[in-house]
Amino acid sequence: MDLILSAVLVLGAIALIAALVLFGVSKKFAVEEDPRLGQVGELLPGANCGGCGFAGCSGMAAALVKGADAGSIDGLMCPVGGADVMGKVADLLGLAVANTEAKVAVVRCNGSCEHRPRIAEYDGLHTCAAMNSCGAGETGCGFGCLGCGDCVAACQFGAISINPETGLPEVDEEKCAGCGACAKACPRHIIELRKKGPKGRRVYVQCVNHDKGAVAKKACSVACIGCGKCQKVCKFDAIIIEDNVAYVDFNKCRMCTKCVDECPTGALVKVNFPVKKKEE
């Protein structure tokens, strides 16, 4: 009995000493967390979408606190929370936030069944990534939308759906958070984040086909053929022609829409503009 009691006392003493040592070490080498990390984290939406460029909201919070210590959080933006959340974060950190314009996902392909006829049938895993790895897909265009919906699966906000009539993804601007997850999921990079623009108006080229004009037009009737007519009519140098396809720089575009009227194939589109009344 005495032997058992002695063993218990010895083990208890060892456990107590070990606990005291561990407590002392933890106090000595403890890394104190900046309380601002938790405060900023509570302001962020918690979507962990990665649209800010970090793995999640905790990474964004750390970057914001680090930026605050450096005196600026310019260049950091939470696309889900938008200007409201960034304003609250800036107030918390005692900084001024740059006026960052909201962005929305746009689908730069108009190759519906009507404009881009199917010439083959794909019989494999129903994902854009899998189909893209096999070649051009079911049409003659090796650049256009594959229509399997990888972008739809990637969207956490239900902002994208495949139109059953056109076979193309459509973005619900009211739901789109501008996180860019859909753009990352698209193997052909036809989805782009663009500034929403004043009153939601935008002008852009709805095509990414880099083939020469005749080849592109044969594959899709509304393809950009790189003719340069839009570039010539633009007075603001907002359009560039690179690798046989036009691109509108939204930082320079003044949305006069002359380029849209000049485009011979309809590859240039304008969104959310008022419908012009026909002259009687």
Predicted ranges, named:
Residues 229, 239-241, 245-247:
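Strongly charged, low-complexity linkers/loops
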Residues 2-233, 262, 266-280:
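Ferredoxin-type iron-sulfur electron-transfer modules and their immediate structural context
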